[in-house]
């Protein structure tokens, strides 16, 4: 089966200078992939020419005349820039020409345009960004990581249901464990939104294990961690900054003297393995959960190596039939979670979900 993906080549901080080289490298390593490069044709052609890939049959240029800037308000992307690379890429997925879209564009705009073009799955109020964070035994699914900075308690409940369905679909776990990210394990901790969300989760049939703290994120304490997009994005980027700092410190210390350089030479295999494990670029690419089609969000600041990983997330999700499996899991969950409404200050809600992923990935923010 040929995996067809659309690439929003103009998205992100670096545009075609990153997205096109990543696409070229990806198709050369994956002969069953076909990528549609969407954006300003002249800019894409210039990059392809530089890479001697103008005639590559696995790459197709799809012209778009507008670009959604990283600081464009959502309404501009949605109402004014109807021929943007982002919108055209999503339209091709909607029309069935491609199976997934990969974009490093403005997160708020991508979420809004994706919801408008692709629509949400039944029962989903707000799609969320989900990211698989590595832990000692595998990965922990965390959501939301930037799509919804302000959430009501029932939204956090729905994120938990979506995470439940995603892990159930990917891992075959009947009862994935759920944790609510908070400033303490005690039920009295947190703001009113978190406290109410905890009440809703405890009243649900989900396998809710209570509050988890920031130091639980990488321990594998639970299968799914739920939070609003503001907290989730800060936690994610703090982790990435820490990983980068550790790599820089190790490099600096081993370069201090001739003796330390000799020690580094002896320890090189270990250092290379360490560098690979903490390199956040290989976890780039997060799913927008709750849409009727697959959309993968890359970091806006991604380099070509990181963006290639985001493409791989979409490719793997299609190959593994993740959307179909999630849709089935959601249908099962709607039965297992019950049809009763969860009262949240007058807002009714019933449970389903949706998403992506096959191996540890990453996620985003409003500019991410």
From Swiss-Prot:
Listed GO CC annotations: cytoplasm
Top-level class of the enzyme under EC nomenclature: transferase
Keywords, in A-Z order: Cytoplasm, Lipid biosynthesis, Lipid metabolism, Phospholipid biosynthesis, Phospholipid metabolism, Transferase
Matching Pfam families: FA_synthesis (PF02504)
Region (Disordered): 335-368
Name the record gives this protein: Phosphate acyltransferase
Higher taxonomy: Bacteria, Pseudomonadati, Pseudomonadota, Betaproteobacteria, Burkholderiales
Reaction it catalyzes: a fatty acyl-[ACP] + phosphate = an acyl phosphate + holo-[ACP]
């Amino acid at each position: 089966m040929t995996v067809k993906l659309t690439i929003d080549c103009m998205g992100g901080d670096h545009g075609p200078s990153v997205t096109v080289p990543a696409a070229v490298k990806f198709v050369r390593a994956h002969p069953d992939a076909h990528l549609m490069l969407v954006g300003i044709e002249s800019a894409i052609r210039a990059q392809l020419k530089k890479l001697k890939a103008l005639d590559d049959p696995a790459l197709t240029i799809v012209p778009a005349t507008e670009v959604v800037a990283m600081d464009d308000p959502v309404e501009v992307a949605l109402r004014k820039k109807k021929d943007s690379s982002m919108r055209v890429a999503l339209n091709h997925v909607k029309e069935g020409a491609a199976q997934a879209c990969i974009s490093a564009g403005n997160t708020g705009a991508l979420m809004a345009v994706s919801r408008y073009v692709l629509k949400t799955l039944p029962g989903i109020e707000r799609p969320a960004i989900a990211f698989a964070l590595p832990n000692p035994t595998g990965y922990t699914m965390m959501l939301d990581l930037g799509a919804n900075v302000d959430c009501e308690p029932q939204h956090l409940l729905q994120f938990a249901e979506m995470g439940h369905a995603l892990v159930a679909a990917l891992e075959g776990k009947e009862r994935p464990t759920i944790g609510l990210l908070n400033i303490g394990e005690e039920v009295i901790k947190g703001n009113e939104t978190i406290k109410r969300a905890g009440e809703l989760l405890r009243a649900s049939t989900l396998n809710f294990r209570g509050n988890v703290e920031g130091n639980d994120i990488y321990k594998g304490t639970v299968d799914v961690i739920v939070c609003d997009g503001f907290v989730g994005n800060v936690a994610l980027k703090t982790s990435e900054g820490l990983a980068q700092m550790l790599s820089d410190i190790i490099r600096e210390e081993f370069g201090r003297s001739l003796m330390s350089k000799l020690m580094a030479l002896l320890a090189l295999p270990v250092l290379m393995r360490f560098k690979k494990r903490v390199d956040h670029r290989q976890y780039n690419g997060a799913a927008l959960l709750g849409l009727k089609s697959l959309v993968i969000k890359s970091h806006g600041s991604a380099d070509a190596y990181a963006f290639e990983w985001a493409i791989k997330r979409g490719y793997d999700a299609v190959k593994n039939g993740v959307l179909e499996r999630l849709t089935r899991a959601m249908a099962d969950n709607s039965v297992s979670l019950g049809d009763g409404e969860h009262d949240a200050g007058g807002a009714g809600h019933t449970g389903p979900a949706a998403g992506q992923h096959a191996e540890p990935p990453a996620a985003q923010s409003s500019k991410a």
